[in-house]
Regions:
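N-terminal hydrophobic membrane-entry segments
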Residues: 1-173
Length: 173
């Protein structure tokens, strides 16, 4: 009987230690670093929890999911779009735009890919702008077209969490 107690004294701490290691690995926190040029969006069990600003954080890896969002200014170009004017004349135009993520939560949750959404918003804004005017009017107000495109798309872009500081049109031959 004494041999059984001796075995328990030897193996019981090992079993407890193994159990603690298993529990610790299940609930262990994970250290993450958010850099100056990004923001982190934390979802706890699939629901929005908080936005992380630059710094170091501890997250529970079993319950928390981190999505990183780059908030640096980026550029997008839409080359050579052929657009019909109101008088059915084809015009080839390119767009160059600068954008930046303003609201990381909106950028992640409202659309599946905010870059593609921006591309589509600019493309549709361009088509709306050109299809509503005849070619003579477009040529007469050439300098104003970029401003009008910017005005028509800026609100739609802000709805998906982006800011659009610049949207420029350039005619193509």
């Amino acid at each position: 009987m004494a041999a059984i107690y001796d075995a328990l004294f030897i193996f019981m701490p090992i079993v407890v230690l193994i159990g603690l290691i298993i529990v610790w690995s299940y609930f262990s926190p994970k250290r993450v670093v958010i850099y100056e040029y990004e923001r982190g969006v934390v979802f706890h069990n699939g629901k929005f929890h908080r936005i992380l600003v630059p710094g170091a954080y501890w997250l529970l890896q079993r319950f928390d999911t981190l999505q990183r969002v780059d908030v640096r200014a980026r550029f997008i170009t839409i080359p050579g779009q052929e657009v019909l004017t109101a008088d059915n004349i084809n015009v080839k135009v390119s767009i160059a735009a600068s954008f930046q993520v303003n609201d990381p939560l909106k950028a992640l949750t409202i659309t599946s890919n905010y870059s593609e959404s921006l591309y589509m918003i600019l493309q549709l804004g361009l088509r709306d702008l050109f299809s509503s005017s005849p070619v003579e009017e477009l040529l007469a107000k050439r300098g104003e077209l970029s401003k009008r495109l910017f005005e028509t798309t800026v609100e739609k872009v802000s709805n998906i969490g982006l800011t659009l500081p610049i949207a420029l049109l350039s005619p193509r031959t």
